Regions:
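Dinucleotide-binding Rossmann-like beta1-alpha1 core, especially the glycine-rich loop
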Residues: 1-58, 180-183, 187-191, 216
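A general structural signal for well-ordered alpha-helical segments in protein cores
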Residues: 2, 30-33, 52, 84-85, ...
Length: 230
């Protein structure tokens, strides 16, 4: 999709197909990854099963002492969020879509139990269908129409190292599910993130996502992050 759109609208999404490597450190996880690989191959997805020796050879940055193996998906990748957003917007406009920026939804209009439109910046816009694609704000917007959406954001932590000499720009995204961590190359540095089991609910004082938090950040909490670096 992204490659086709890049050509269609002549704008780069910053797409890099470095692949993704998922590793296993116990038998249960290894069996799970093997099942995933088998299922993916049934749908003609390119998945390669690697033993620990292959992982050590191809990705010496990984300590393989406790690794049983992994699966590599060369078709996975990452893109620049701003590039993707602009590319999708440009493609949508070419197909006749209109985009209104800085236009928060004041109200979802309904009649006889059916959604009929939205009120934006004081202006009512009639529509046959509404697609709610507002991420972590979806729950609050759904409430305006009496809809309960079971969605709530959690704080997400990551760190970025200092520049690492000879760090490969083609390093895949490495996922270590057993340690709830992931790693990827980021402009010559290594980004390390976590998806912890006991995550911290965001905005737990008000239980509401601020309208102006699009580019906001949470305070540092290294005590919460540090156990995953051991």
């Amino acid at each position: 999709l992204y490659k086709d759109l890049e050509k269609k609208v002549d704008h780069s999404a910053g797409l890099r197909l470095n692949g993704a490597l998922s590793i296993a450190q116990n038998k249960e996880r290894w069996q799970e990854l093997l099942r995933q690989a088998t299922t993916a191959q049934l749908y003609d997805v390119d998945v390669r099963v690697l033993n620990k020796d292959q992982i050590k050879k191809d990705y010496p940055i990984i300590n393989t002492d406790e690794i049983l193996g992994g699966i590599f998906m060369p078709g996975d990748g990452a893109a620049d969020p701003s590039g993707v957003t602009y590319m999708l917007a440009k493609a949508a406009k070419k197909e006749g879509a209109q985009i209104f920026e800085k236009s928060p939804v004041d109200e979802i209009l309904t009649k006889q139990g059916k959604i009929t439109g939205v009120k934006v910046n004081g202006q009512e816009i009639e529509c046959e269908y509404i697609v709610l694609a507002s991420g972590m704000w979806s729950r609050q917007i759904g409430e305006k129409a009496g809809i309960s959406i079971p969605l709530y954001p959690a704080e997400h932590f990551y760190i970025i190292t200092e520049p690492i000499e000879n760090l490969s720009k083609t390093l895949p995204v490495i996922r270590d599910f057993d340690n709830r961590t992931y790693f990827k190359e980021d402009a010559g540095k290594l980004l390390v993130g976590i998806f912890e089991g006991n995550s911290i609910p965001a905005f737990n004082k008000t239980n509401k996502v601020p309208e102006d938090f699009s580019f906001g950040e949470f305070p540092e909490n290294f005590e919460h992050f540090e156990p995953y670096l051991k």
